[in-house]
């Protein structure tokens, strides 16, 4: 019964962005996988729903220039296990220090390094805005801004708790 109530509340309030199947789309996270920027515990999911999240990836075009964007794109794609031009990727790796503050020195993201913001893991080949060379270049060149709205004042804590439990259950079907 609780699962069905959670599903109904999810469909009414969350499906517009995350999809009726909770698999997300470009710019909206998949809630069924295990790729979570802030953690996938029931408490963290509830906190995200209650208070929302704001994420920002800065634009690097001015700092890197066209050549630097191309090099950094190659390195980021190499981190994800893709075939790239090694010379470009090596040059990108030399510049990766400016990215390490958020993504960690190994590119595994803020969650892997207990950092307080939601910088994604660049090594898992999961891409919120697309993993094509063009999409990665656009992210580096222009940056990204993501907003998850706060639902505490809209739905109240009880309904948020039920939706949180539903999301946790669909993202952890083995538990």
Feature names for model-found ranges:
Residues 26, 32-81, 115-169:
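Extracytoplasmic electron-transfer domains, predominantly the class I c-type cytochrome c fold
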């Amino acid at each position: 019964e609780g699962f069905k109530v959670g599903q109904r509340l999810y469909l009414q309030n969350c499906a517009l962005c995350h999809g009726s199947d909770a698999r997300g789309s470009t710019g909206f996270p998949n809630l069924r996988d295990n790729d979570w920027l802030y953690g996938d515990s029931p408490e963290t999911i509830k906190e995200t729903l209650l208070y929302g999240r704001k994420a920002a990836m800065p634009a690097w075009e001015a700092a890197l220039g066209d050549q630097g964007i191309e090099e950094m794109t190659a390195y980021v794609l190499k981190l994800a296990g893709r075939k790239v031009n090694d010379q470009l990727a090596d040059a990108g790796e030399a510049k990766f220090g400016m990215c390490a503050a958020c993504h960690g020195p190994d590119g595994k993201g803020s969650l892997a390094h207990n950092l307080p913001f939601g910088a994604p893991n660049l090594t898992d080949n999961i891409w919120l805005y697309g993993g094509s060379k063009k999409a990665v270049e656009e992210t580096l060149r222009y940056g990204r801004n993501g907003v998850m709205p706060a639902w505490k004042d809209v739905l109240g804590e009880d309904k948020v708790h039920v939706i949180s439990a539903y999301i946790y259950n669909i993202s952890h079907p083995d538990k």
